[in-house]
Amino acid sequence: MDVLVVGGTGFIGQHLCRELDDQGHAVTALSRSPADATLPDGVETVAGDVTEYDSIESAFEGQDAVYFLVALSPLFKPDGGDGMHERIHLGGTENSVQAAEEHGVDRFVQLSALGADPDGDTHYIRAKGRAEQVVTQSSLDWTIFRPSVVFGEGGEFVSFTKRLKGMFAPGVPLYPLPGGGKRTKFQPIWVGDLVPMLVDSIESENHVGETYEIGGPEVLTLRDVTNQVYDAEGSSVSVVPLPMPLAKVGLSVLGSVGFPMGADQYRSLKFDNSPATNDIDMFGVSSSSLTTLSGYLRG
């Protein structure tokens, strides 16, 4: 199949392009900065900005399937402010769906997020929810994935965890966690486990019109994640529990003066980022076969 990966030079995108190429598909990766990626020689790259329809439209010509992977991180306030979530997630999806419909693309796969909701608590979740509506109301044969946090080579989940160490007291191994890190939950999935499911979704008609919530083999609190990250490298940190009301005020104030986290990041800390029902079985995958975060960290 001829496959276009919108956001193909990002973390998940590069892994997906490699897997698609390995499976014999003709792959094109579209991104704003295609030269920054390390992709197989067989993967074509094209430059385009999803917020500008005319810059991406021609890339959809002749494609059998399209993946939309472009996303801003919910872990930080985006450059340009929270309104960028609407511009990128919603606007980018609208432009991509329009181009796919214009060129008769057969399959459209949207990478969304757990909790996506047009009326959600954060700009990120609302934009993701509205983007899903654009996809489901289109004429395309679509599939939507809502993964929990994804980890692996090139990802930011583990590096973000490390960045918090000493953030408020450089050089001191203190780790401030709102609520002691016990309230925030994830079900992390390794990118190497997620990508084959993404590929399978365009190779079987069984996945058309389906929305899948995807998680890894275990539910972890933010404190669990923190401990695993530092245990794996043989170091330790002292967790400093921050009362949730204090974290709310602190992040709101810091966000207003340019700190890369703000009110939305506080709201995200209260969100259970694990799927209600893990749909990995729809791809013939069992939980016991998946890579744990600790297993990945220890190599």
Show the residue positions of the predicted features.
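A hydrophobic C-terminal alpha-helical subdomain
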Residues: 245-299
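Oxidoreductase cofactor-interface core, primarily capturing Rossmann-like NAD(P)-dependent enzymes
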Residues: 118-231
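Residues forming the Rossmann-fold NAD(P)(H) cofactor-binding site
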Residues: 13-14, 90, 129
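NAD(P)H-binding glycine-rich loop region in Rossmannoid oxidoreductase-like domains
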Residues: 35, 43-95, 99-102, 114-117
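Rossmann-fold NAD(P)-dependent oxidoreductase module
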Residues: 15, 19, 80, 99, ...
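Short, polar loop motifs at secondary-structure junctions
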Residues: 29-37
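N-terminal Rossmann NAD(P)H-binding glycine-rich loop of SDR-like oxidoreductase domains
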Residues: 3-23
